[in-house]
């Protein structure tokens, strides 16, 4: 019986009955829950809407988990997300669900107010961001994921052409296992600095001239992108391990160029 609410004592609790098949379930819970959140920024907090996946391990003798308690956890959380708050949510989930292992994943749009390089006009730029966290064998690990759109310009095209060079939008995706709190826009800014040029939501003509020439003066293959971001991540003490991907949506082909680097700095 579920005795957390004395008023429910007389109502049968089927999920709390024993299961005779004796098969443990690695993950059971709720998936694709859209729920508001706030996230920590360098200047304060930012509201957003998260898509949540929340799972726990279910022991072989238990028939079911307490599905409503996942949503109750989201209702109870009023703190802005950072590494410490997110880790606390995972620990609280295990206590509420009476489980010894579990995982929470959340993804959400994140906006940064950016200033154009010449005119100084300001505009919002959106990014795809997420936290993934898991407690297993008593150990907590939290990963910050960011997808950062940038500009890349082809060094070969620049070298062989009398004028101009093909360029395109690229996506740099980093999943970083964190040792300490790392504010989202800190990581995004460090990634953007490795591209041919960063992107902006709004540019005036002097800005467009600047970003065009900036990319032309800073050509990079997809291999250059991942290697330069990897150097940055290798020097970032708050990152323990990472998976790093770059995809160039080639402007002269109907396919993408792609590169990946994975490193666990704890083993290096």
UniProtKB/Swiss-Prot annotation:
Give the metabolic or biological pathway. Answer: Cofactor biosynthesis; 7,8-dihydroneopterin triphosphate biosynthesis; 7,8-dihydroneopterin triphosphate from GTP: step 1/1
GO molecular function: any one? Answer: GTP cyclohydrolase I activity
**UniProt xrefs under InterPro entries:** GTP_cyclohydrolase_FolE2, GTP_cyclohydrolase_FolE2/MptA
Q: Which Gene3D superfamilies match?
A: Urate Oxidase
UniProt keyword list: Hydrolase
Q: Which family does it belong to?
A: Belongs to the GTP cyclohydrolase IV family.
Q: Which GO terms describe its biological process?
A: tetrahydrofolate biosynthetic process
Q: What does this protein do?
A: Converts GTP to 7,8-dihydroneopterin triphosphate.
Q: NCBIfam families under this entry?
A: PRK13674.1-1
Could you read off the lineage of the organism from its UniProt record? Bacteria, Pseudomonadati, Pseudomonadota, Betaproteobacteria, Burkholderiales
Report which superkingdom the organism of origin falls in: Bacteria
- What is the name of the protein in this document? GTP cyclohydrolase FolE2
Catalytic activity reads: GTP + H2O = 7,8-dihydroneopterin 3'-triphosphate + formate + H(+)
A Pfam family reported for this protein in Swiss-Prot or TrEMBL: GCHY-1
EC no. given is 3.5.4.16
> For the site May be catalytically important, which positions are given?
154
